[in-house]
Amino acid sequence: MIESQKILVRHEGNTPRERSECGWRDRLISREDATLEPAAWAHAVDIDGAKPHFHKVATELYYVLDGGGSVLLDGFKHEVRKGSIIHIPPGVVHSAVGRMRVLVIGIPGIGEADYFEVVNDNVNYA
């Protein structure tokens, strides 16, 4: 990172990898990069058991890098595959099933205070 210009070049594989609410993620640009004052964060996520949830503040963009499956947005199922992009505004309950690698961009970055799991959801997400 070039401090004076707040520029970042980072390569997948040289990033923190961790279990998240939606699967395994590589933090490409994240809360650890606060000194950059990023307009958003970006994670590469291997979807695995993403539970229904929503955000009150953040918008999410999903771009399917590989694989496929479906995303559920406010109870409606949408098939996705490599090359699909999904726009998820604040307040939309969403989940994903299938085997896919997704670039997830949170605008602004999504913190734990803006993650709300939906516990009593009667929609069949399979």
Regions found by a protein language model. Give the residues of each.
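Double-stranded beta-helix
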Residues: I2-H11, R19-S20, T35-P38, V97-A126
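Short amphipathic beta-strand/extended segments with alternating polar/hydrophobic composition
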Residues: H11, W41-H43, E79-K82
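A short glycine-rich, His/Asp/Glu-containing loop-to-beta-strand
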Residues: N14-P52, A58, I105, D114
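Short secondary-structure boundary/capping segments
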Residues: P16-R17, H53, K77, H94
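Glycine- and acidic-residue-biased ligand/ion/polar-headgroup-sensing regions
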Residues: G49, V57-S70, D74
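Short beta-strand His + acidic residue motifs that chelate non-heme Fe in jelly-roll/DSBH
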Residues: P52-H53, V71-L72, I88, V92-R99, ...
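A cytosolic small-molecule/anion-sensing beta-strand core signal
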Residues: L65-D66, R81-K82, G98
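Short acidic-glycine-tyrosine-enriched beta hairpin
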Residues: G75-G91
